[in-house]
C-alpha cells in the first residue's frame, strides 16, 4: 500500500454506494407516503380520481431508481486495491444522487399531497400540480447527472 492507495480507500466507495441507495430510498419513501395520505384522504369522497392522482407516487418511486443506478455503477467499480482519489469520487457520486434524491422526494411528497387534495376540489389545479412535480423530479435528475459524470472520472491514471 502506498500513500495514494491506502487500505481504507475502498471504504469511501462503499459508503458512496450505500448512501446513494439509502438517501434516495428515504426520499422516495417519504414522497410515496406523503402523497399516499393525500390520495387516501381524497378518494374517500372522490374514488373516481384514484388513478389520475397516482402520478406523485409514481414520480416518487422513480427517485429510488436513480439511486439504484448509481449504487450499482459504484459497486461494480469497487476493488480491494483502489486509489484514495477513486474512493472519494465514488463517495461524492453517492452523496450527490442520494441527497438530491432525498430533497426531490420531500418536494414530491409535499407537492403531491397538496396537489391531490386541491385537484379533487378544483380539477384545473391538476396541470399545475404536474408541472411542479416535474420540476421537483428534475432535482433528483440533476444529482443523477452529476453522479454519473463523477463516476466516469473515478478511474484515473493512479496505479496501485
Swiss-Prot record:
GO terms for cellular component: fungal-type vacuole membrane; Golgi membrane; membrane; proton-transporting V-type ATPase complex; vacuolar proton-transporting V-type ATPase complex; vacuolar proton-transporting V-type ATPase, V0 domain. It is a multi-pass membrane protein. The record marks 137 as: Essential for proton translocation. GO terms for molecular function: proton transmembrane transporter activity; proton-transporting ATPase activity, rotational mechanism. It is found in: Vacuole membrane. Residues 32-53, 113-124 are cytoplasmic. One of its GO terms (biological process) is vacuole organization. V-ATPase is a heteromultimeric enzyme composed of a peripheral catalytic V1 complex (components A to H) attached to an integral membrane V0 proton pore complex (components: a, c, c', c'', d, e, f and VOA1). The decameric c-ring forms the proton-conducting pore, and is composed of eight proteolipid subunits c, one subunit c' and one subunit c''. Proton-conducting pore forming subunit of the V0 complex of vacuolar(H+)-ATPase (V-ATPase), a multisubunit enzyme composed of a peripheral complex (V1) that hydrolyzes ATP and a membrane integral complex (V0) that translocates protons. V-ATPase is responsible for acidifying and maintaining the pH of intracellular compartments. PANTHER family: V-TYPE PROTON ATPASE PROTEOLIPID SUBUNIT. Belongs to the V-ATPase proteolipid subunit family. NCBIfam families: V_ATP_synt_C. Present with 8450 molecules/cell in log phase SD medium. This is V-type proton ATPase subunit c. It comes from Saccharomyces cerevisiae (strain ATCC 204508 / S288c). The lineage of its organism: Eukaryota, Fungi, Dikarya, Ascomycota, Saccharomycotina. The gene is VMA3.
